[in-house]
C-alpha cells in the first residue's frame, strides 16, 4: 500500500457531509422576535420606526 491509500479514504468523507437547507443560508431581515405592541416601550417603537424607514430607503435605493 502506497501513500495514495490514505488520500482515497480522506476524499470519500466529502460525500457524507450534511447539507445546509437554503432557508438557513439566507440572511435574516433583522426581525428576530415577535411581541405585542402593548408590551413595547417607547424606545422599542422608535427603533422599529427607524428600522422601517431604513428598509424603505434601502428599497428605494436598490430600484
From Swiss-Prot:
Biased composition regions of type Basic residues, renumbered to the chain: 1-15
Superkingdom in the source lineage: Bacteria
Pfam families membership: YfhD (PF14151)
Compositionally skewed regions (Basic and acidic residues) per UniProt: 45-57
Region (Disordered): 1-63
Annotated Acidic residues bias: 30-44
InterPro entries found in the cross-reference section: YfhD-like
Name of the protein this chain belongs to: Uncharacterized protein YfhD
Organism taxonomic ancestry: Bacteria, Bacillati, Bacillota, Bacilli, Bacillales
Gene: yfhD
Amino acid at each position: 500500500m502506497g501513500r495514495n491509500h490514505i488520500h482515497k479514504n480522506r476524499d470519500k468523507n466529502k460525500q457524507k457531509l450534511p447539507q445546509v437547507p437554503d432557508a438557513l443560508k439566507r440572511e435574516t431581515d433583522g426581525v428576530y422576535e415577535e411581541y405585542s405592541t402593548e408590551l413595547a416601550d417607547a424606545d422599542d417603537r422608535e427603533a422599529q420606526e427607524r428600522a422601517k424607514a431604513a428598509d424603505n430607503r434601502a428599497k428605494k435605493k436598490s430600484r
